[in-house]
Each structure stands twice: as structure tokens, then as C-alpha cells.
């Protein structure tokens, strides 16, 4: 009976020990699973972090490309603006050259008008001198004619005077002749 109890107690201890080992092994497995799960989660987090970093790099690259594209766009814009300003400056220079030519033509026309007025005045003065000379000649002819007329008048007068003297002398001679004849008679 005593041995039966001991065997029972032994059996009890064995079972207890077995259960204890089982529980220990279970806890061990549990811890193992926990560690494994933790490692899994760590790996997962690592992969997620890697993916996030890749996405970040992708976004960075995208932004970089976008920025580079914008930079190129700005550069093209500036280039277009330079060309536009160049063309505008060229047109402006063309307009200035045209205005310069216009001013030149205008100045030439003005100079021509000036020369024409000068020639006109010259012709006027020439005509005036011509008229003066003509009037002078006319006055000369007129004076000449008047002198001629006065000369002829004097000649006629002298002639008349001469005839008058001749007739008086003749009359006197006649009177004297008659007187002598009367005295002789």
C-alpha cells in the first residue's frame, strides 16, 4: 500500500514534471514565435521604410525633373524673350533708320525749296536790274530826244532870228538906197 502510494506520488511528480516541461516548451515556442513575429515585423518595417525611401527618392527625382523642366522652360522663355527683344530692337533700329532717311529727304527738299527761293530772288533782282537798265536807257533816249528837240528849237529860233536880221538889214539897205536916191534927186 505504501509502495502504491509512492508509485502514485512518483507518477504524479512525473506527470507534473512532464506538464512543467510541456508548459516550458510551450512558453519557449511562444517566445520563439514572438521573436519570429517581431523579426517579421522588423523586416516588414524595414521593407516598408525602404519602399517609402524609394518613393521619396522617386518623388525627389520627379521634383528634380519637374524643377529641371521648369528651369529649362524658364531658360527657353528667356531665350524667346531675348529673341523678341532682339527683333524689337532691330525693328526699332529700322524705324530709326527710316526716320533718319525721311529727315534727310525732308532736309533735301527744304534745301531745294531754299535754293529755288534763292534763284527766284536772284531772278527777281536780275529782272529788277534789267528794268532799271531799260528805264535808264529809256530816260537816256527821252533826254536825247528832248535835247534834240531843244537843239532844233534853238536852230529854228536862230534861223528865224537870222532871217529876221537879214530882212531888217535888207529893209535898212532898201531904206538907205531910197534915201540916197531921194537925196540925189
From Swiss-Prot:
UniProt region (15 X 8 AA tandem repeats of [QR]-R-[GVE]-R-[EQ]-[RSAV]-[EGQ]-[RAK]), positions on chain: 2-158
Compositional bias annotation for Low complexity: 174-185
Entry annotated with the keyword Membrane: no
Domain of life: Eukaryota
Repeat (Sequence) residue spans along the chain: 2-9, 12-19, 20-27, 32-39, 40-47, 56-63, 71-78, 84-91, 92-99, 102-109, 114-121, 122-129, 130-137, 138-145, 151-158
Keywords: Repeat
Protein name: Octapeptide-repeat protein T2
Amino acid at each position: 500500500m505504501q509502495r502504491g502510494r509512492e508509485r502514485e506520488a512518483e507518477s504524479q511528480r512525473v506527470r507534473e514534471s512532464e506538464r512543467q516541461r510541456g508548459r516550458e516548451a510551450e512558453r519557449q515556442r511562444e517566445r520563439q514565435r514572438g521573436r519570429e513575429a517581431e523579426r517579421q515585423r522588423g523586416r516588414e518595417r524595414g521593407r516598408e521604410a525602404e519602399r517609402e525611401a524609394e518613393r521619396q527618392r522617386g518623388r525627389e527625382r520627379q521634383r528634380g525633373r519637374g524643377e529641371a523642366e521648369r528651369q529649362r522652360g524658364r531658360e527657353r522663355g528667356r531665350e524667346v524673350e531675348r529673341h523678341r527683344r532682339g527683333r524689337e530692337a532691330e525693328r526699332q533700329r529700322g524705324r530709326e533708320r527710316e526716320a533718319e532717311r525721311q529727315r534727310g529727304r525732308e532736309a533735301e527738299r527744304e534745301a531745294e525749296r531754299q535754293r529755288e527761293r534763292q534763284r527766284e530772288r536772284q531772278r527777281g533782282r536780275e529782272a529788277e536790274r534789267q528794268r532799271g537798265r531799260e528805264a535808264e536807257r529809256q530816260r537816256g533816249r527821252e533826254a536825247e530826244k528832248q535835247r534834240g528837240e531843244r537843239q532844233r528849237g534853238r536852230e529854228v529860233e536862230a534861223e528865224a532870228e537870222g532871217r529876221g536880221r537879214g530882212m531888217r538889214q535888207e529893209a535898212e539897205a532898201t531904206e538907205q538906197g531910197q534915201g540916197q536916191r531921194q537925196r540925189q534927186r
